[in-house]
Structures are given as C-alpha cells and as structure tokens.
Amino acid sequence: MKIIIAPAKKMQVDTDSFDATTMPVYLKQTQKILTMMKQLTYSDLKMLWKCSDKLAQLNYERLQGLDLKYQLTPAIMAYVGIQYQYMAPDLMTEKQLAYIQEHLRILSGFYGVLRPFDGIVPYRLEMQAKLKIDNYNNLCQFWGAKLYQNLYKDNRAVVNLASKEYEKAVRPFLQEDDKMTTCIFGEIIDGKVKQKATPAKEARGEMVNFMALNQVKNTKELKSFDRLNYAYRADLSSADKMVFIKNELHK
C-alpha cells in the first residue's frame, strides 16, 4: 500500500533534523526541467509561477544557482505547510519514520514523486504549471505515466490524501484492478458534504501520523481514525471514497 500527498508551496533548508538518506528516483528528468527553466526569462518564469513580483524575484535568483546535489533537505522536512505541521515527522519514532519512508509518497511538479527521506532543494513549480517538456504540453502529462508506474509497481492499492491537482496526474492511468481510495474530510452543510481547504490539510497530516503510529496495512484500518473530532461515515462512503465528518459540536 502507498499513500500519496501533495507538496507545499513554502519550502525550507533543514540539514540538521534528519539526514537525506536517498535520492529522488527521477532526478534525470528533474535536471531536464531545471535546465529548461534556466533558459526562460524572468517574465516567462513569473507567468509560469503565477506569483507576486517579490516571490518571483526570490525564486528567480534561487533558480540561477540551483544545484540538485547540494545542501539537501529530506523531503518530509523541506515542505513547510499545514499538512506537514500536523504530520509532525520530527516527533515520530524510528519505526514510524521507517513506515512513512516505505509507504508515503509526495507528488511533485519538479521531482515527480518523492520518498520522505529523498534529498531535495527548495523550488517553485506546481503540477498544473504549463511548462512544455519534450512532446508534452504540461507537467501533468510529462509526469503522469511515471507517477503511475512508481506507485503501482508491485502494489495495487493507494490511499489518496493529495489535492485534485496532483491526483489527476495519476488517475487517467489506473487499470481495472488498481485501487485508489480517496479520503474526504468534511462537514455537513445544507445536507451535503463540504470539504474546506485548511481543515482538510490538517486532517490529511493527522491521517499520515495516525497511519505511521498504527502501522496501518489496509484501508479498513482507517475507519478508526477519530482525530480532530472526525468520524468515519460508512453511509456517505463508497468503494473508492472514505468520508470522515467532523463532529457537529467541535466545528
């Protein structure tokens, strides 16, 4: 079983907490993307990144000196976001860290797919970015088949804790006997399940932590997840979707 999550836009260099023990699987492809990005003008990159002048300037300067093998931070510590805070890898035991290294995969527009202890550098490139690589019109097309092969090689089940932007890179390649179970963390509003961005990120991080703590081996075990006052709702779930609803009293 594999677990997929999305990266965070904000990143940091942290070479002290943990050592980077592995290298990204698709580093050759990442180097190709990096080379292409370095050939773009500042204006082209700003348009690609869809960000403010301040962020564009920061990332443009960072890009010019980017070295994929220097000052590496384990992926699990490199991303700074709500999901990663709630995952709390810095508080995990050796056994829990070994679990996420084996099962957790971070999907990335720049690196493709990452294990938690793959050594990476800060970058800015979302999966939805319209960067043409080889004969592909965008990163989703460029990475899609590679992500699928990586996730489903010798494995038929994936727990999807990623955002739709990243999930849709993999989904078109699913075969009939492949299973992707999406976890929805929501609340009932006007009789319908509504998933809000921030609470969902919190819950996804907690779910990864929960799975590592309990060494979860199959999706049935996820039904007991009750953190942040969520509870599994079988009546709202389906074969490929597990719905967790926040308790009315704790919204």
UniProtKB/Swiss-Prot annotation:
GO terms for biological process: response to hydroperoxide. It comes from the Bacteria. InterPro entries: YaaA. Pfam families: H2O2_YaaD (PF03883). GO terms for cellular component: cytosol. HAMAP family: UPF0246 (MF_00652). Belongs to the UPF0246 family. NCBIfam families: PRK02101.1-4. PANTHER family: PEROXIDE STRESS RESISTANCE PROTEIN YAAA (PTHR30283:SF4), PEROXIDE STRESS RESPONSE PROTEIN YAAA (PTHR30283). This is UPF0246 protein PEPE_1842.
